[in-house]
Amino acid sequence: MAKYLIDAKKNIDSIIFIEENIDKVCNLNLRRKVEELRREFYINCCVVLDKSHPKNKKKICEDKLIEAIYYERDKNCAHRDDDYKSLEFNQLSDMIETMKHQIQQVLVVCKDSLPNNITLDFVSHDK
């Protein structure tokens, strides 16, 4: 389960890398790459949540950050629903901050199921 949390963190790290190096990677389809990283992020976070709380989705979704993670996974990542409303971000940094808050909340909610020594140290990294 820790692997999925670390993979979700690496998705954020990759978006940080894109933001910091946008002038060097501008010839790539960045919109598609960022969307792919976000999709993987939400799927990985939900794997951690589902494995940590297999029968308590309704209860943990009382937390608005957790509810937003499931919303993205269920309405946009697993399949695109007609009623899906995407979050609008003016800058990649806004998206990064939102995702950081979300993964930190996943760590809090799932702390009893994860190793004690796991940390979320974000670094600019292209995987």
What are these regions (language model features)?
Residues 1-68, 83-127:
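Amphipathic alpha-helical interface segments
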